[in-house]
Amino acid sequence: MKTLALLAAATLALPFAAAAQPARGYSAVPATAPTVATMMTRSTPWKCAGDRCVTNRTEGSPLTMCQLAAKELGTLTAFTANGAAFPDEQLAKCNTRAKSA
């Protein structure tokens, strides 16, 4: 019975783990945890949970996608594009478009 409960819990956690850090698509981590479950940037839907928002869309320039996310979420502390983290200088450029608090 205990094994069944653990298996069920692990199965339920899988979608959240996959959403946390997509290998394809984009992931944005704002300085302040998102207060919305979903958001749209232009025509890109994002899902937010925990400390980040993710989308599986791969179209568009990574810098543009980062700037659009920052415009909605505020200053980002991390951004990944197709599994690759933005270097500090790219993140700083992205955050020039961050919404004011």
Question: For each predicted feature, which ranges?
Answer:
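Classic N-terminal secretory signal peptides
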Residues: M1-Q21
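Post-signal/leader-peptide non-cytosolic segments of secretory proteins
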Residues: P22-K99
